[in-house]
């Protein structure tokens, strides 16, 4: 298991007009890597590898991030109802080089999710739980939102928010063991 600590960073996650889901994720993940690396350097923190990630739901090239209000969550769920959409997570594992440069390796995971058609009552009841409020696309497959999912093609953990296999591949790239028995 990898020991970790949370490093709080702040990046602008607003969409840019005509930006597709993949371009958006690439930009946000790179911004997060840069912000984390700069914070480590500026605050003279221990030079440890750092992981950043961001997840979006997309349908017909439209990005569905986290809803900002209950009304926004309601609109998102209504639009995703009865669709097959994509959940994409961009992840990067960064580190500070000996020359104090921010370096990183990056990966993505894509999962197709088929959502059943939702009634207005189902959407309203779900939004009232407040579960949608911190989830890309306004639903959580690991919670009550699972009742809306007819099926997935790809990585379940990606839909939850962190694709484990892709994360392990990045750790392997930097020779970081994630097994409790150290190599």
Outline where the language-model segments fall.
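Anionic-ligand binding patches
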Residues: 18-183
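N-terminal glycine-rich phosphate-binding loop and ensuing alpha1 helix
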Residues: 1-28
């Amino acid at each position: 298991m990898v020991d970790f600590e949370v490093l709080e960073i702040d990046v602008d996650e607003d969409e840019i007009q005509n930006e597709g889901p993949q371009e958006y994720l690439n930009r946000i993940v790179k911004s997060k890597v840069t912000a984390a690396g700069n914070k480590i350097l500026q605050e003279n923190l221990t030079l440890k590898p750092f992981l950043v990630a961001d997840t979006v739901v997309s349908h017909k090239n439209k990005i569905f991030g986290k809803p900002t209000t209950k009304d926004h969550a309601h609109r998102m769920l209504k639009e995703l109802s009865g669709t097959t959409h994509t959940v994409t997570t961009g992840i990067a594992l960064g580190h500070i080089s000996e020359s104090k440069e921010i370096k990183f390796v990056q990966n993505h995971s894509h999962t197709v999710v088929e959502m059943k058609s939702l009634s207005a009552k189902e959407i309203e009841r779900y939004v009232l739980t407040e579960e949608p409020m911190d989830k890309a696309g306004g639903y959580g497959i690991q919670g009550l939102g699972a009742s809306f999912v007819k099926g997935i093609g790809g990585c379940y953990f990606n839909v939850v928010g962190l694709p484990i296999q892709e994360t392990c591949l990045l750790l392997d790239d930097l020779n970081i063991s994630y097994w409790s028995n150290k190599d």
